[in-house]
A protein has these predicted regions:
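Acidic donor-binding loop of glycosyltransferase active sites
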Residues: 170, 278, 294-311, 326
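Nucleotide-activated donor-binding/catalytic signature segment of Leloir-type glycosyltransferases, i.e.
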Residues: 257-258, 264-291
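Conserved donor-binding/catalytic core segment of Leloir-type glycosyltransferases
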Residues: 216-234, 239-243, 255
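Carbohydrate-associated surface elements
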Residues: 37, 178, 196-199
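Membrane-proximal helix-turn-helix segments that form the acceptor-binding/catalytic region
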Residues: 20, 96, 115, 122-126, ...
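N-terminal subdomain of nucleotide-sugar transferases
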Residues: 1-60, 248
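A charged, aromatic-enriched C-terminal amphipathic alpha-helix characteristic of glycosyltransferases
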Residues: 211, 356, 369-401
Length: 405
């Protein structure tokens, strides 16, 4: 099968689509990528790349066509808009170099923005091939929520655009069941919308650490670890509030891996509230080092603010926590909270509930090793039953086969 993947992001940027493309290439399909010039997350072109530099290359036998775009820069609203729009036009331009190639299907990877599908629709119309659209970020809900734009011109522009994209997609896969109703309510046939979750990369599995990365924390402490973006959506104000509540419990330590727009604010709050002895910002590390860090934590944390879009979202980090057999403590509403409960992998409380988060952490910190290990084993069992990579890849291959029969 000849598969054209359209994704604004691809290697050397670190996204799950890299793993997907390599897997399908290894299954003896011919994979071609239409993507942008790498600039995520730093906001500048990666070394060796430019708008019209290194636009054609090969990675693991996969042919890559890179479109020129304006890098995202500091991530301001204006710069992101320019980044998204320039990818649309740059990819349509670049797609002319693909028109002499044979493709059986177009697979669109959408962590955001949804407009990544527009170049795919352009190619579909010319070559008459089906589009399978994998939606990881629900538009317009996510952008409206993030920008507090529930009224005004932005929703009026986005709503018909989103409907156009969904209408022109032959199959829509969603990473959370909560997305389905929202898409169907836009007038889309429910029969072409299916749940297809994210998986954890193969490196995420239970491991024994080779070294102690947390040797600055007393040995018998209870370590809560957060890995990922330190942003507005993750509600670090409530996490800090929970840390303040637990400040007197000297055995509880918070370990934060990652970075983001709120990192400086979090550091200032740590200093302001004298949390330096228990709240540790460690910065970002390569993805391949994450399982070893996870192995040194007693439980893994994730949280999202109280917004409708977040209540129907399952953050990708959840699968990595489950795959590494880690107990989970979460401050989240809706789909992700239900997942933790169904898996019996830890404790959850509603979004923006620092007091309840503190209570749940206290409860977990009093459990013995065997009880924590049981939660971790529940997490791994649930992952293997619901999100295991090979199982999902087989299912995707079956979807592609049905679409191309």
């Amino acid at each position: 099968m000849n598969i054209l993947i359209v994704s604004q992001y691809f290697y050397p940027e670190n996204f799950r689509i890299n793993d997907f493309a390599q897997e399908f290439q290894s299954r003896e399909h011919k994979v071609t990528i239409l993507t942008g010039t790498p600039n995520y997350p730093g906001g500048d072109y990666y070394e060796g790349y430019g708008a019209f530099k290194k636009n054609r290359e090969s990675y693991e036998g996969i042919e890559i066509f890179r479109s020129p775009l304006i890098p995202r820069g500091s991530g301001s609203s204006v710069r992101l808009a320019l980044n998204y729009i320039s990818f649309i036009f740059g990819s349509i331009f670049t797609s002319f170099f693909l028109l002499n190639k044979k493709f059986d299907i177009i697979f669109v990877f959408e962590p955001s923005p949804i407009t990544v599908c527009l170049p795919a629709i352009f190619i579909k119309k010319i070559k008459n091939i089906p589009i399978c659209f994998w939606v990881l970020d629900l538009w317009p809900e996510s952008v409206v929520s993030a920008g507090n734009l529930k009224t005004g011109i932005i929703p009026k522009i986005l709503n018909p655009l989103v409907k156009f994209i969904y209408t022109n997609s032959d199959k829509i896969l969603v990473s959370s069941r909560g997305f389905i109703n929202s898409i169907v309510e836009k007038g889309i046939n429910k029969n072409k919308v299916d749940f297809f979750p994210q998986w954890a990369e193969p490196i995420f599995k239970p491991v024994k650490p080779d070294k102690n990365n947390l040797d600055f924390i007393p040995q018998n402490s209870f370590k809560i670890m957060f890995a990922g973006n330190i942003g507005e959506a993750q509600d670090f104000s409530s996490i800090i509030e929970a840390a303040i509540i637990l400040k007197a419990k000297k055995n509880i330590h918070w370990v934060i891996l990652g970075g983001g727009r709120k990192e400086d604010w979090v550091k200032a709050e740590i200093k302001k509230n004298k949390l330096e002895n228990c709240f540790h910002i460690m910065g970002s590390y390569p993805l391949e080092e994450m399982p070893e860090f996870y192995a040194q934590a007693d439980c893994m944390l994730f949280s999202l603010k109280k917004e409708y879009i977040f209540s129907i979202t399952i953050p990708a980090k959840v699968q990595t926590y489950l795959a590494c057999a880690k107990p989970i403590v979460a401050m989240i509403d809706g789909e992700a909270a239900k997942l933790i409960d169904d898996a019996q992998a830890g404790l959850s409380c509603p979004s923006e509930s620092p007091e309840l988060l503190a209570e749940n952490i206290t409860r977990l910190s009093t459990l013995g090793k065997n009880e924590l290990d049981k939660l971790g084993q529940n997490a791994l069992n649930y992952y293997n039953n619901e999100f295991e990579r090979t199982m999902l890849m087989d299912r995707m291959e079956s979807i592609f086969n049905k679409m191309t029969d």
